[in-house]
From Swiss-Prot:
UniProt cofactor note: Binds 1 divalent metal cation per subunit. Can use either Co(2+) or Zn(2+).
Family as reported in the entry's similarity comment: Belongs to the sugar phosphate cyclases superfamily. Dehydroquinate synthase family.
Protein name: 3-dehydroquinate synthase
GO biological process: amino acid biosynthetic process; aromatic amino acid family biosynthetic process; chorismate biosynthetic process
Membrane-traversing stretches: none
Amino acid sequence: MSPDTAADAAADPALQSSVLTVSLGERSYPIHIGPGLLGRAGALIAPLLRKPRVFVVTDATVAALHLDPLLASLGAAGIAHDHVVLPAGEATKSFSQLEELLDLLLAARFERSTTLLALGGGVIGDLVGFAAAILLRGVDFIQIPTTLLAQVDSSVGGKTGINTAYGKNLVGAFHQPRLVLADTTVLDTLPRRELLAGYGEVVKYGVIDDPAFFDWLEEHGSALIAGDGGARIHAVLTACRAKARVVAEDEREGGRRALLNLGHTFGHALEAETGFGPTLLHGEAVALGMVMALDLSVRLGLCPPADAARLRAHLDHVGLPTDPRRLEGAPAWNAERLLAAMDHDKKVEDGKVTFVLARGIGRSLLWREADTASVLATLRAAVAP
C-alpha cells in the first residue's frame, strides 16, 4: 500500500496494534485497532485535545464494563473528565434523548475547547456524534466503539444521527471524529447475539468488493465469533481499511460510498416494522437485507443464483438470521408495508429507490432501475406466511 493511499497502516508488533488514517486533508484522523487500547486511551487521546478536558457519554451496559478503566486512563494522562450514563438500547437514538443530552451539556457549561467522547456501540456513537455536530455549532468528538458493529462500521466515516417515526438515521449530519479507538479486547464482553450482529456488517465488506475477504470469512468466521483475537483484529482492520478508503474518496455519499449501504434498504424497512426494538438488531437486519438484495439481484438477472445461495449458506452457518419469519417475536410481516417504508430511504431520488445490488460476491453496484413488481416479489418471498 503506497503512502498516499486513503488508509495507510502502520503495525506495532510489540502491542499487536495497527493504525489506519482516514485521509480527509485537515480533517484526517487515525483509527487505532488492537487489544488493550482502552488502558492506553488517555495517552493516545491527549495529543489531540484542544485542552485536557473531555466529557464521556456512555450507556448503562457499557458503563458497568468499561467506564472505570477509561476514566482511570484519562486521569493518568492528566485529562480532566466528566461523564453521563444514558439508557442502553436503540430507543436512545431519539429526539428526546438528544435534547436531554444537549441540555445536560449546556447546563454543565460545556465549552468548545472540551471534547466529547463516545464510549459505546453504534447508538451512542451516532447520538454523541450528532450532538457534537450541532452543539455550539460544532465541537470535537472521539469514538471509542465497544461493539463489533461499531468498530467495523458506524464509528468510522462521520455519519451521525438519530431515528424518527419515519425511519432510521433520517435526521443527522456528517461530522468526522478526531480519533477512533477500537480496542478488540472489549469484544470479549459482548453477548453472542451482539457479536453476531456485528459480524453481519463484517460480511458486507466481502460481498461489496472483496471476494478474497469473503473467502477468508468462510474459513475463519466461526473462529472470529468464538473468540479468536487474531481473527478479530484482522476482520476489524480489513473492514476499517476498506471503509477509510471509500470515505476518503466520497465523504458525503455522492457515489461510491453508497455501496456501503448494501443490505440497508431492505434492512431498515424491517427495523422500522419492528419499531427499532430488541426483536431485530441492526446487524441482523443488514444480514437479512443482504440476502434480500441478492435475491432481487437474481430476479433482475444480475447475479448467479449460486452466489446468493453462498451468502445465505455462510450467514446460516455462523448463526445469523436469513429468514425474517423465523425471528423470535417477529411481527406479522406485510410486504406492502415494507415497500412503503422503503420510500423513506435516504437513497430515494426523484421518487425512486437506489438499491445496492450485486453481480456476485465481491461485485456490488448501484441500481436505480428495479421495477416495483420485482421488489415486491422479493419482499413477498422473504416475509409471506
